[in-house]
Amino acid sequence: MSNRRSRQSSSAPRISDNQMIDLVSKLRQILPEIGQRRRSDKASASKVLQETCNYIRNLNREVDNLSERLSQLLESVDEDSPEAAVIRSLLM
């Protein structure tokens, strides 16, 4: 079992500490909750990753909700109308 684990980890590309720091720094810049903080109030890498996961989950929920609303809207318009074509394109 340890051989399998070592083979799996050796086949995955390794991320250097500098790359990790750079990636976390980029996440800090793009996450709304973190970007609003003062410079002196920097979040830890762990906190940044946790907030990133939460943000992605929230975005997925929003996409699901919007898709549901578009589906309901599509049911209420004539299926041959230009509006229906636009709605269908948004759902794809």
Swiss-Prot record:
Keyword Transcription set for record: yes
Primary location: nucleus
Induction: By gibberellin and epibrassinolide.
An example Gene Ontology biological process: unidimensional cell growth
Coiled coil: none
PROSITE patterns cross-referenced by the UniProt entry: BHLH
One MF annotation (Gene Ontology) recorded for this entry: protein dimerization activity
Tissue: Expressed in roots, leaves, stems and flowers.
Location relative to the cell: Nucleus
One GO cellular component term noted in the UniProt record for this chain: nucleus
Keywords per UniProt: Brassinosteroid signaling pathway, Gibberellin signaling pathway, Growth regulation, Nucleus, Transcription, Transcription regulation
Entries under PANTHER family matching the protein: TRANSCRIPTION FACTOR PRE, TRANSCRIPTION FACTOR PRE1
Miscellaneous remark of the record: Gain-of-function mutants (T-DNA tagging) show long hypocotyls, pale green and slightly narrow leaves, elongated petioles and early flowering. They are not sensitive to the gibberellin inhibitor paclobutrazol during seed germination.
Function: Atypical and probable non DNA-binding bHLH transcription factor that integrates multiple signaling pathways to regulate cell elongation and plant development. Binds IBH1, forming a pair of antagonistic bHLH transcription factors that function downstream of BZR1 to mediate brassinosteroid regulation of cell elongation. Regulates light responses by binding and inhibiting the activity of the bHLH transcription factor HFR1, a critical regulator of light signaling and shade avoidance. May have a regulatory role in various aspects of gibberellin-dependent growth and development.
Protein name: Transcription factor PRE1
Origin species: Arabidopsis thaliana (Mouse-ear cress)
